[in-house]
Amino acid sequence: MEISWGRALWRNFLGQSPDWYKLALLIFLIINPLIFLVNPFIAGWLLVAEFIFTLAMALKCYPLLPGGLLAIEAVMIGMTSPSHVRAEVAANLEVLLLLMFMVAGIYFMKQLLLFIFTRLLLSIRSKALLSLSFCLAAAFLSAFLDALTVVAVVISVAVGFYGIYHRVASSRGEDNDILDDSHIDQHFKVILEQFRGFLRSLMMHAGVGTALGGVMTMVGEPQNLIIAKAAGWSFGDFFLRMSPITVPVLVCGLLTCLLVERMGWFGYGEKLPEKVRQVLQQYDDQSRLQRTRQDKVRLIVQALIGIWLVIALALHLAEVGLIGLSVIIMATSLTGVTDEHAIGKAFTESLPFTALLTVFFSIVAVIIDQSLFSPIIHFVLQASEHAQLTLFYLFNGLLSSISDNVFVGTIYINEAKAAMENGTISLNQFELLAAAINTGTNLPSVATPNGQAAFLFLLTSALAPLIRLSYGRMVWMALPYTIVLTCVGLLCVEFTLAPMTEWMTQQGWLATLS
């Protein structure tokens, strides 16, 4: 029997999202204009809370849809104006270019990255050293590349290896369905479960590695670029100003990696079963024999482009997004990718998030127009200069662990810069606050998948159900890192940030905002 028009419309609205979620969004859309008529300030805060809710519920529906509907309504009822949204987007064009072109550029270097992680996995037999290597490699790559892309590559490696062993274990050849374990003997199931535990721990180490490396440079995370632009810092300035916090955090993060692996805490410590290693090694040996000279040239070209990328970023030869565009042009030209559709695939990962970031800027425009954060900022700025750093770090960390860190970082750096321009805080204090805001948004946010885009990407990937990586298990496995990164970051903000920054300024290493 044909369903009614109303039922058809309800089913189409937000697609497969739960009915309670659809109903909640409709209630938001109905009450927002009514409350705005009574009290714009409360309506503004309600909008922010609703938007954070859509981010927290990202597994129910991609936040672009519900968040976009809320943003459109906010503009329509006068919470902000289209011209202000346009101004916010224009002010953050570099970030949008980063997401559009840099992520797409790295897509064409995936073969090299796959090669690197495959070599690591099969060359290092010690699980503790392998975990440390994955964490370090992810950290280094994320300092120069987009964290989403790094995680996507590690996911590709893990899915590939899981599929290889699953095919052997099920004895079904090319017809094998990696989601179906019904054809696997009990002995192989035990080994497969161990392999899942091994892959879960590696994925979490790599994910945390992207956070450890991403916080260190202005291109590591999208919000870093927003903060660097507000403070007028170059690539080198940003790295040096973050180093009093990020270097100790990196060291402690790597020690945590070794500790949880050695002790087998929080679901870590599972080793690669020897039978799985033999299967994977045979497959890799066969792949290497089949690699042509043309394939080897592609790897060499991608490595050279990687060197160009690091040099161009370090010397700030152009805007980050334009450097990414140069990577796209060189990588496609020199590796033979000439088809428009093949090139278009590179943009599928980044454009949804780019659109979501534009919606963020709409909400930021509402926050500015309605002065929503003024009471909080006023409260923080009443404290002593030293206490301000701690409060900014903690407020950022708390919000970033439940919301998106790009959103949180953008709000707080805008408020801090406004306070500096109004003469409420000094230039020197603003630069210290910028460092506290950056580390506050990046480090505590590893607590949940909501805070780190790379974690959310992992949780929603095809790999997660294969290795039994649920939301709760991810939070549990991230817990030791959350505690260590947050506490060490806080101690560094308290005790090393100001004196080390002052010392580097005296040495003439740091530029200041003019």
Curated annotation (Swiss-Prot):
MF terms (GO), sorted A to Z:
sodium:proton antiporter activity
Gene behind the chain: nhaB
Keywords of this entry: Antiport, Cell inner membrane, Cell membrane, Ion transport, Membrane, Sodium, Sodium transport, Transmembrane, Transmembrane helix, Transport
Cellular component terms, GO, for this chain's entry? Answer: plasma membrane
**According to the lineage, what is the superkingdom?**
Bacteria
- Please name the InterPro entries in this protein's record: Na+/H+_antiporter_NhaB
Identify its membrane topology class. Multi-pass membrane protein
Where is this chain primarily localised? membrane
Summary of the function given for this chain in its UniProt record: Na(+)/H(+) antiporter that extrudes sodium in exchange for external protons.
- How is this protein named in the record? Na(+)/H(+) antiporter NhaB
Q: Where in the cell is it found?
A: Cell inner membrane
Pfam families of this UniProt entry?
NhaB
Q: Which residues cross the membrane?
A: 23-43, 52-72, 97-117, 120-140, 144-164, 202-222, 238-258, 303-323, 353-373, 391-411, 447-467, 475-495
Describe the family membership recorded for this protein in Swiss-Prot or TrEMBL.
Belongs to the NhaB Na(+)/H(+) (TC 2.A.34) antiporter family.
Catalyses which reaction(s): 2 Na(+)(in) + 3 H(+)(out) = 2 Na(+)(out) + 3 H(+)(in)
